[in-house]
Swiss-Prot record:
GO BP field: endocytosis involved in viral entry into host cell; virion attachment to host cell
InterPro entries noted in UniProt: Capsid_L1_Papillomavir (IPR002210), Capsid_L1_sf_Papillomavir (IPR036973), dsDNA_vir_gr_I_capsid (IPR011222)
Organism lineage: Viruses, Monodnaviria, Shotokuvirae, Cossaviricota, Papovaviricetes
One GO cellular component term noted in the UniProt record for this chain: host cell nucleus
Gene name of the record: L1
Family: Belongs to the papillomaviridae L1 protein family.
Subunit comment: Self-assembles into homopentamers. The capsid has an icosahedral symmetry and consists of 72 capsomers, with each capsomer being a pentamer of L1. Interacts with the minor capsid protein L2; this interaction is necessary for viral genome encapsidation. Interacts with protein E2; this interaction enhances E2-dependent replication and transcription activation.
Residue ranges of the region described as Disordered: 270-289
Function: Forms an icosahedral capsid with a T=7 symmetry and a 50 nm diameter. The capsid is composed of 72 pentamers linked to each other by disulfide bonds and associated with L2 proteins. Binds to heparan sulfate proteoglycans on cell surface of basal layer keratinocytes to provide initial virion attachment. This binding mediates a conformational change in the virus capsid that facilitates efficient infection. The virion enters the host cell via endocytosis. During virus trafficking, L1 protein dissociates from the viral DNA and the genomic DNA is released to the host nucleus.
GO molecular function: structural molecule activity
Pfam (any one): Late_protein_L1
Protein's UniProt name: Major capsid protein L1
Source species: Canine oral papillomavirus (strain Y62)
Subcellular locations according to the entry: Virion; Host nucleus
Keyword terms of this UniProt record: Capsid protein, Disulfide bond, Host nucleus, Host-virus interaction, Late protein, T=7 icosahedral capsid protein, Viral attachment to host cell, Viral penetration into host cytoplasm, Virion, Virus endocytosis by host, Virus entry into host cell
Length: 503
């Protein structure tokens, strides 16, 4: 009797082939022309903890928030190289080629002295010292307000990354409950990891995690005051490294350090998640402390030996497929540096002059300010892209806006006969089609960046700029000439005549 049995082995079907992403080196050719661009001295002044409004409920900001724990995202605007007038007509053919910029060097200058940044909260939730406890405090769920005024130094962070698109950040935030899932009021809500664009002014992780504190901490006492209404973002290095085109991060440099300064516990009940009874032996008074532990960070020593800024960086190979090509004639530089975070204390007398007599604290008004100083210098290389059908197809798949900026049309004209009215806006004809004219829309118009216009800052004389001279020495283009030492004193030496022997 013949019996059919299913096959016991499992067949592996390979995934569908995807479009191969080519490196920019395969369709972008580089020239031997380099340019230097440098910004002016970039300064910003503000309050280190919060914004100051003109009135209590007004939206007019009179003093901005300038914290050393914020991201600085510079949008470097470069000129269009296709509009340059080159003396060498054989450099490129505008009918067959287009010019783009390639990043080769970068230096981020930082002014101001090194200093420890200080943060804190006047009503910080510090219930008990659980690192060195001297007594058992189990009244964390009582009605007594145990919050204190506490300051600390945050995690020390130095980081910068550059690309032709803004960097991505990640943080944990509140999410919705699943449909049909039963939950009660006061239950711990579900959270999810979100990816957002890092904008200028976003807060950095200072040692309390990358999360949305405004949505996940309702009592506004668990973290320092500068992040209590913000979301601390951490750069999503994993996602940017796996990006197909590699436009968001050509390369990055980072240095982070911290240690646990104090270990404490939080006040408040533990909600619907108490400590399991099988994890401890019961006490006679049934007073069990809370397990909501946390540590206060400390960035420790700040020294000039560990500085990442005020030094040049050269790009030979990017981490992604984009090897430093600035599509759209722009670059996005994301910077974090809280090693120069000294808060400036300003004291002013009530009559705008020092008070006479004995010191009275109420006679003076105290203010806080924080200042930052930057300078950005870059070396860019002139590159060419041939307008071949293959190259245009690659670039159009990557970003169609690049083709539009080059004033090219990849779609053929329509073969149908359309109607065109001469007096379309008159009362004698039909109503015009309500289609707004198509304009170039900035894809990053809704984001906040520090725009730095470098269109009038380009120079080809690299030996006249500090970064340009470093680049020339690095590439063996310029070497110091050998100095000939000439003797200024002449000493006459008398030689004795050599007597010849007579034969």
């Amino acid at each position: 009797m013949a019996v059919w049995l299913p096959a016991q082995n499992k067949f592996y079907l390979p995934p569908q082939p995807s479009t191969k992403v080519l490196s920019t080196d395969e369709y972008v050719s580089r020239t031997n022309i380099f340019y230097h661009a440098s910004s002016e001295r970039l300064l910003t002044v503000g309050h280190p903890f919060y914004e100051i409004y003109k009135e209590e409920r007004s939206e007019e900001v009179i003093v901005p928030k300038v914290s050393p724990n914020q991201y600085r995202v510079f949008r470097l605007l470069l000129p269009d190289p296709n509009n340059f007038a080159f003396g060498d007509k054989s450099l490129f053919d505008p009918e067959k080629e287009r010019l783009v910029w390639g990043l080769r060097g970068l230096e981020i200058g930082r002014g101001q002295p090194l200093g420890i940044s200080v943060t804190g909260h006047p009503t910080f939730d510090r219930y008990n010292d659980v690192e060195n406890p001297n007594k058992n405090l189990a009244g964390h769920g009582g009605g007594t307000d145990s919050r204190v005024n506490m300051g600390l130094d945050p995690k020390q962070t130095q980081m910068f990354m550059i690309g032709c698109k803004p960097a991505l950040g990640e943080h944990w935030s509140l999410t919705r409950w699943c449909t049909g899932q039963v939950h009660t009021a006061g239950q711990c809500p579900p959270i999810e990891l979100r990816n957002t664009t890092i904008e200028d002014g976003d807060m950095v992780d200072i040692g309390f995690g990358a999360m949305d504190f405004k949505a996940l901490q309702h009592y506004k006492s668990g973290v320092p005051i500068d992040i209590v209404n913000s979301a601390c973002k951490y750069p999503d290095y994993l996602k940017m490294a796996n990006e197909p085109y590699g436009d968001r991060c050509f390369f990055f440099v980072r240095r982070e350090q911290l240690y646990a300064r104090h270990i404490m516990s939080r006040s408040g009940t533990q909600g619907l998640e108490p400590v399991p009874k099988d994890t401890y032996a019961t006490r006679e008074d049934n007073n069990i402390g809370t397990t909501n532990y946390f540590s206060t960070p400390s960035g420790s020593l700040v020294s000039s030996e560990g500085q990442l800024f005020n030094r040049p960086y050269w790009i030979q190979r990017s981490q992604g497929k984009n090897n430093g090509i600035a599509w759209g004639n722009q670059l996005f530089l994301t910077v974090v540096d809280n090693t120069r975070g000294t808060p400036l204390t300003i004291n002013i007398g009530q009559q705008d002059k020092p008070e006479e007599g004995n010191y009275v604290p109420s006679s003076y008004r105290t203010y806080l300010r924080h200042v930052e100083e930057y300078e950005v210098s870059i070396i860019v290389q002139l590159c060419k892209v041939k307008l071949s059908p293959e190259n245009l197809a690659i670039i159009h798949t990557m970003d169609p806006n690049i083709i539009e900026d080059w004033h090219l049309n990849v779609t053929p004209p329509s073969g149908t006969l359309d109607d065109t009215y001469r007096y379309i806006n008159s009362l004698a004809t039909k109503c015009p089609t309500n289609i707004p004219p198509k304009t170039n829309v900035d894809p990053f118009a809704d984001f906040k960046f520090w725009e730095v216009d470098l269109k009038d800052k380009m120079t080809e004389q690299l030996d006249q700029t500090p970064l340009g001279r470093k680049f020339l020495f690095q590439t063996n283009v310029l070497r110091p000439r050998s100095v000939k030492v000439r003797s200024t004193s002449h000493v006459s030496v008398k030689r004795k005549a050599v007597k010849r022997k007579r034969k």
